[in-house]
Amino acid sequence: MPAKLGYWKIRGLQQPVRLLLEYLGEEYEEHLYGRDDREKWFGDKFNMGLDLPNLPYYIDDKCKLTQSVAIMRYIADKHGMLGTTPEERARISMIEGAAMDLRMGFVRVCYNPKFEEVKGDYLKELPTTLKMWSNFLGDRHYLTGSPVSHVDFMVYEALDCIRYLAPQCLEDFPKLKEFKSRIEDLPKIKAYMESEKFIKWPLNSWIASFGGGDAAPA
């Protein structure tokens, strides 16, 4: 039975989950809530048997989960992506946390009502953050070496969203630029991005100051 996902009809926190499932070739069905579906979600929220009801959610024949990182870890664990030693598992957990920091730094700016005032400071600090990630990646193809793992999709999605705000941000970081292209060139990811299922925009909720409109910046 295909897993069931639920989220808003945006990229948001669910996009890395979608990318991971597509890469793994796992079948899933997704319920997408639109801009005007808040009442629909509130009607569903406490009637699905979720322990901690929220979006995104993931339901399969063995468990019902919310919280995007928990969902990612569960799927990754089923496919042996969480490491085989305490040291490997700790390192992967560290990357997960840093990946969420990367994304949430972007998100905080995007949802700030004073977006135009605060984005300058964010963009000023961005090269330092990207340099850290470039140094961490080093000469590896993927963040944990090889093959690709769930954390690669977390970092990829953050980088892809950030480039809408700073289109040239990766030009000084060729290793990150190559990493991003490497993810996009994975056959199943490439096919997904060319399909009708792929959500290119919006990046964030419709209430966001940036990344939440009906159309991407020109």
Swiss-Prot record:
Residues 85-203 form the GST C-terminal domain. It is an enzyme of class 2 (transferase). It is found in: Cytoplasm. It comes from the Eukaryota. GO terms for cellular component: cytoplasm. The keyword Cytoplasm applies. Its EC number is 2.5.1.18. Substrate binds at residue 111. Glutathione binds at residues 7-8, 41-45, 54-55, 67-68. PROSITE patterns: GST_CTER (PS50405), GST_NTER (PS50404). It catalyses: RX + glutathione = an S-substituted glutathione + a halide anion + H(+). Pfam families: GST_C_3, GST_N. Its main location: cytoplasm. Keywords: Cytoplasm, Transferase. One of its GO terms (biological process) is glutathione metabolic process. GO terms for molecular function: glutathione transferase activity. Residues 2-83 form the GST N-terminal domain. Conjugation of reduced glutathione to a wide number of exogenous and endogenous hydrophobic electrophiles. Belongs to the GST superfamily. Mu family. Homodimer. This is Glutathione S-transferase class-mu 26 kDa isozyme 51. It comes from Fasciola hepatica (Liver fluke).
